């Protein structure tokens, strides 16, 4: 046929049977990838430390999505929360992966069948005997079925009525578990961090989809609207479908990057804004203050801070710190976290408590500056020692650890103090194993960053695809030079411009 690569899809343009076939094959590829990727991730995933080496540190991409929908157990006998299980049931991680692969195989066979048996009676217009599709009717069917699925997910799966529920956690990502969620019908349901809104919105959107589907099945579009929007053209379907997909991609890129109830930090890692705003640092200080108010010692108050909360307050878990083209998991960057060393408190020789100024997200290097509680600079690590006034040596800075592995240990040696001051720029201090994975010490992004980048990029590409195909279908007559209302027989090759009798070719 001699088609260029960018025109190959014209072979299914007027062939409904094979158009269906290639879409079934596409579903087979998507489902097969999902199942295969899940099995690969399960093969390399280490479930032994859900606190310091969670799935998002290990670069898992599909496991978090299974987990947020209620899958927590493996046929390997482990649970995502760190315990062991004896009877995980069929809907384990491996069970879901296997179901996708089986479904992929069935779709593969169905695609082959529809490719071979393309000339079905159902695709023929009984009046003309030519292949045609009743696109408004098909739209109604799909809208109705999508509405049923959407309603069913919200009313049964999320609520636990017939299903496991979804992953729900506290605002600091400490107590997450799969549980049933009741729909929230008030204004708070519009808060993106309220899980109840997920149930209520799916129920509402599903109901609307069912009603709209029934409407489009029972009411034919007016002729002028049908012609104006080119409802008989399959490229109209392509254009509007691309619009739906790119809109969804933009939305989920936002909910992933900025955070929401659908993207829990226990499964996808914290957001960059939680580092920028000192979100976990404030909660840690609040808990320590509460402990001191209960007459606990500083050491006891810091020892009560959960290691999980301290680990969130570390810049290496900020998804915006990883470079765009640094491949690999976070563990391949700064290493596997082994333990929290504790919280370092710095003091000068007058006994003032000093705070290390933290590194902003988009800095690779940052000066080491120690300020007092009023924000006055009291010490630093100078660039030029000859001109320094606030060096650790001159000010006599010491450091003492509270909580963690170094609880109660203090250092006055300037070199050691400076080492921990530098590390304090990056948040709480952790011991990191860089040997096991040969980690290079350069920060990586989390799956939160990858997902956002991928979906925002493809949404932009698909936006242009929507404009392209929408313009092609709306202005098809202009581009082709054929008046769609032309009743006269058009003989191709007679005119220089097809259908234009004023441009009759000169006989040779």
UniProtKB/Swiss-Prot annotation:
GO terms for molecular function: chlorophyll binding; electron transporter, transferring electrons within the cyclic electron transport pathway of photosynthesis activity. This is Photosystem II CP47 reaction center protein. The keyword Membrane applies. It comes from Oryza sativa subsp. indica (Rice). Keywords: Chlorophyll, Chloroplast, Chromophore, Membrane, Photosynthesis, Photosystem II, Plastid, Thylakoid, Transmembrane, Transmembrane helix. It is found in: Plastid, Chloroplast thylakoid membrane. GO terms for cellular component: chloroplast thylakoid membrane; photosystem II; plastid. One of the components of the core complex of photosystem II (PSII). It binds chlorophyll and helps catalyze the primary light-induced photochemical processes of PSII. PSII is a light-driven water:plastoquinone oxidoreductase, using light energy to abstract electrons from H(2)O, generating O(2) and a proton gradient subsequently used for ATP formation. It is a multi-pass membrane protein. The chain crosses the membrane at residues 21-36, 101-115, 140-156, 203-218, 237-252, 457-472. Coiled coil: none annotated. PSII is composed of 1 copy each of membrane proteins PsbA, PsbB, PsbC, PsbD, PsbE, PsbF, PsbH, PsbI, PsbJ, PsbK, PsbL, PsbM, PsbT, PsbX, PsbY, PsbZ, Psb30/Ycf12, at least 3 peripheral proteins of the oxygen-evolving complex and a large number of cofactors. It forms dimeric complexes.
């Amino acid at each position: 046929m001699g088609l260029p690569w960018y025109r190959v899809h014209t072979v299914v343009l007027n062939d409904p049977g094979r158009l269906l076939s290639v879409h079934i094959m596409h579903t087979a590829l998507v489902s097969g990838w999902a199942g295969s990727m899940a099995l690969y991730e399960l093969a390399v995933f280490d479930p032994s430390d859900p606190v310091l080496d969670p799935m998002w540190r290990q670069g898992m991409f599909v496991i978090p999505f299974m987990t947020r929908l209620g899958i927590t157990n493996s046929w390997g006998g482990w649970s995502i929360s760190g315990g062991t299980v004896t009877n995980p049931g069929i809907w384990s991680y491996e069970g879901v992966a296997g179901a996708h692969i089986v479904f992929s195989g069935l779709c593969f066979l169905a695609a082959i069948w529809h490719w071979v048996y393309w000339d079905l009676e159902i695709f023929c217009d009984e009046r003309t005997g030519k292949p045609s599709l009743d696109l408004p009717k098909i739209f109604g069917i799909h809208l109705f079925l999508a509405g049923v699925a959407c309603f069913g997910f919200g009313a049964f799966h999320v609520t636990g009525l017939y299903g496991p529920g979804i992953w729900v956690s506290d605002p600091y990502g400490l107590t997450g578990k799969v549980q049933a969620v009741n729909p929230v019908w008030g204004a708070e349901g519009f808060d993106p961090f309220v899980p109840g809104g997920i149930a209520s919105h799916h129920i509402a959107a599903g109901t609307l989809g069912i009603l709209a589907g029934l409407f489009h099945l029972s009411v034919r579009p007016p002729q002028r609207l049908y012609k104006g929007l080119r409802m008989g053209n399959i490229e109209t379907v392509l254009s509007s479908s691309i619009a739906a997909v790119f809109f969804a991609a933009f939305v989920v890129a936002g909910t992933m990057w900025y955070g929401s109830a659908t993207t829990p930090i226990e499964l996808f890692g914290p957001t960059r804004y939680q580092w920028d705003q000192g979100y976990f640092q404030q909660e840690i200080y609040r808990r320590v203050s509460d402990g001191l108010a209960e007459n606990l010692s500083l050491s006891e108050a810091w020892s009560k801070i959960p290691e999980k909360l301290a680990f969130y307050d570390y810049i290496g878990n900020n998804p915006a710190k990883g470079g765009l083209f640094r491949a690999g998991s976070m563990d391949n960057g700064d290493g596997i976290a082994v333990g929290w060393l504790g919280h370092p408190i710095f003091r000068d020789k007058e006994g003032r408590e000093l705070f290390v100024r933290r590194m902003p997200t988009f800095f690779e290097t940052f000066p080491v500056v120690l300020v007092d509680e009023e924000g006055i600079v009291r010490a630093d690590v100078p660039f030029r020692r000859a001109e320094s006034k606030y060096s650790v040596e001159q000010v006599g800075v010491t450091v003492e650890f509270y909580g963690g592995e170094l609880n109660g240990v203090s250092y006055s040696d300037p070199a050691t103090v400076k080492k921990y001051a530098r590390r304090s720029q990056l948040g709480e201090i952790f011991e990191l194993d860089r040997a096991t994975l040969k980690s290079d010490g350069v920060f990586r992004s989390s799956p939160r960053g990858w997902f956002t980048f991928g979906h925002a990029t493809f949404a932009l590409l698909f936006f242009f695809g929507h404009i392209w195909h929408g313009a092609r279908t709306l202005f098809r007559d202009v581009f082709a030079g054929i008046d769609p209302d032309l009743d006269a027989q058009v003989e191709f090759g007679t005119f220089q411009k097809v259908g234009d009798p004023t441009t009759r070719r000169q006989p040779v």
